[in-house]
């Protein structure tokens, strides 16, 4: 319990008025003062759940399945104080994502009985927990547009996508309100995890409610109404979207969804979520939404609504000023040469559902499904930077290895634990009784952690400086 957690009296009174009668107010307050259980989600782009459980079976980790996400687990660790979860080898290799359990629920709702994943939009995506969860379902097929308004969070979003092996993403940096006009009827599936007042996050941060007020709720709800309208306009007819928040008041949740229904009438259908997982009915509202109070599942507070679009709706007319697209698509013959060189050098195969583009001396891999959106939306970053072209050939990039390598390549060098720690600290490796030449895929316990190059009797470290960890790394 954390008795110092700040809970405004006005907030308590508001919850008392809206919380279902069968739920206890005392349990709600006690839950708000109880620290949140940590949770992770296995990244199935890199490893299966079964293989992950085998891999961590020698650790002092107690993993409890999250009922609404078959790749999610609550985690308890004995060594949390000596090594942070983010500095474990498995995390740095992208084998799992640290994600609050409740935040896995919107993507579960998005994906259930939904295979329309050719063109997907995550409208407010940073830092990337739900984006990478969606990417796991897509298995790098189709195109995943990940939008983020805050410029400072784009870099973190990209780093997380790269670490997790996502190569079908295209990043945009806009207010989400532009999508309805710029890209109407463009996306099969949309997640709008809307910016909110964060009432459900009180268990993570005792001061989360320090700036909370009823008036601020109304200001935020106005933004959310604009966002949900834009998302619905950008959704294809027949498509499906999920609206979610990590807050509890009605203004930012039910009322926003009702506003959408009032605006577009029968074009909007709320699909009930009572059978989303065993026990989901405990948080079900009369509209079929999930309104998750923290004491129900011992989790963060959350709201999830699943919405189907049955008819096209009016969209704003906009004048686009895109500028010249700075990339040129590579002809099939040249793409084949690049693919051959990548295979010959690193034993990596280019994905079939992708295009190769160039910008000056840079070589990039874009998802093929991105083509219809080029010229319609301005992108901040797309796909994966494969290489830089030099006189002697291609200099392959770290992100190419992290997204495309499997660890089973002929040129893979598997490091011992002490060597792996040195690698993550940005140092070169000197393998004993081993010599080679050229570039190599560097692995730890058979999973890629970067690209290196033989220089004499050492492997030169190719880890980007921003990914170097200096202290508090995993135990050997």
Curated annotation (Swiss-Prot):
Classification via Gene3D superfamilies: 3.10.450.720, Vaccinia Virus protein VP39
Catalytic activity: cytidine(1407) in 16S rRNA + S-adenosyl-L-methionine = 5-methylcytidine(1407) in 16S rRNA + S-adenosyl-L-homocysteine + H(+)
PROSITE patterns xrefs: SAM_MT_RSMB_NOP
Keywords for this protein: Cytoplasm, Methyltransferase, RNA-binding, rRNA processing, S-adenosyl-L-methionine, Transferase
GO BP, one annotated term: rRNA base methylation
Annotated compartments: Cytoplasm
Transmembrane segments: none
Binding, S-adenosyl-L-methionine: 124-130, 148, 175, 193
GO molecular function, one term: RNA binding
Record-listed E.C. numbers: 2.1.1.178
InterPro entries linked to this entry: Methyltr_RsmF_N, MeTrfase_RsmB-F_NOP2_cat, MeTrfase_RsmB-F_NOP2_dom, Nol1_Nop2_Fmu_2, Nop2p, RCMT, rRNA_ssu_MeTfrase_F, SAM-dependent_MTases_sf
GO CC annotations, alphabetized: cytoplasm
Enzyme class per UniProt: transferase
Active site: 246
Primary localization class, coarse: cytoplasm
Classification via HAMAP family: 16SrRNA_methyltr_F
Family under the similarity heading: Belongs to the class I-like SAM-binding methyltransferase superfamily. RsmB/NOP family.
Function per UniProt: Specifically methylates the cytosine at position 1407 (m5C1407) of 16S rRNA.
Protein name: Ribosomal RNA small subunit methyltransferase F
Species per Swiss-Prot/TrEMBL record: Photobacterium profundum (strain SS9)
């Amino acid at each position: 319990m954390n008795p110092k957690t700040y809970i405004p009296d006005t907030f308590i009174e508001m919850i008392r008025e809206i919380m279902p009668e069968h739920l206890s107010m005392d349990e709600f307050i006690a839950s708000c003062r109880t620290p949140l259980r940590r949770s992770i989600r296995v990244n199935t782009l890199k490893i299966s759940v079964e293989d992950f459980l085998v891999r961590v079976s020698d650790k002092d980790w107690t993993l409890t399945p999250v009922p609404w996400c078959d790749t999610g687990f609550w985690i308890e660790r004995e060594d949390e104080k000596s090594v942070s979860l983010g500095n474990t080898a498995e995390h740095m290799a992208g084998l799992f994502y640290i994600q609050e359990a409740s935040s896995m629920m919107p993507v579960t709702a998005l994906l259930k009985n939904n295979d329309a994943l050719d063109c997907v939009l995550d409208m407010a995506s940073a830092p990337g927990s739900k984006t990478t969860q969606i990417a796991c379902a897509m298995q790098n097929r189709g195109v995943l547009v990940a939008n983020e308004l805050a410029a400072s969070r784009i870099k973190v979003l990209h780093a997380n996508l790269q670490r997790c092996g996502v190569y079908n993403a295209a990043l945009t940096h806009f207010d989400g309100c532009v999508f309805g006009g710029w890209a109407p009827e463009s996306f099969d599936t949309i997640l709008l995890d809307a910016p909110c007042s964060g009432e459900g996050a009180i268990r993570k941060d005792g001061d989360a409610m320090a700036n909370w007020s009823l008036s601020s709720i109304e200001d935020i709800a106005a933004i959310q109404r604009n966002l949900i309208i834009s998302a619905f306009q950008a959704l294809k007819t027949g498509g499906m979207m999920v609206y979610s928040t990590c807050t509890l008041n009605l203004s930012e949740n039910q009322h926003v969804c009702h506003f959408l229904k009032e605006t577009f009438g029968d074009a909007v259908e709320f699909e009930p979520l009572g059978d989303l997982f065993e026990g989901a009915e405990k948080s079900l509202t009369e509209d079929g939404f999930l309104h998750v109070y923290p004491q129900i599942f011992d989790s963060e507070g959350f709201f999830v609504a699943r919405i189907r679009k049955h008819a096209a709706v009016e969209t704003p007319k906009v004048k686009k000023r895109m500028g010249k697209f700075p990339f040129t698509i590579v002809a099939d013959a040249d793409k084949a040469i690049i693919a051959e060189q990548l295979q010959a050098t690193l034993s990596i195969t280019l994905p079939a559902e992708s295009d190769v583009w160039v910008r000056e001396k840079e070589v990039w891999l874009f998802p093929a499904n991105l083509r219809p959106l080029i010229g319609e939306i301005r992108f901040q970053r797309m796909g994966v930077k494969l290489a830089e072209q030099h006189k002697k050939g291609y200099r392959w990039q770290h992100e190419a290895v992290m997204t495309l390598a499997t660890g089973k390549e002929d040129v893979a060098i598997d490091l011992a634990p002490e060597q792996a720690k040195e690698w993550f600290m940005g140092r070169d490796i000197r393998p004993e009784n081993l010599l080679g030449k050229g570039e190599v895929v560097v692995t730890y316990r058979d999973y890629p952690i970067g690209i290196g190059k033989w220089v004499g009797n050492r492997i030169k470290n190719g880890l980007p400086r921003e990914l170097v960890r200096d202290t508090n790394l995993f135990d050997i």
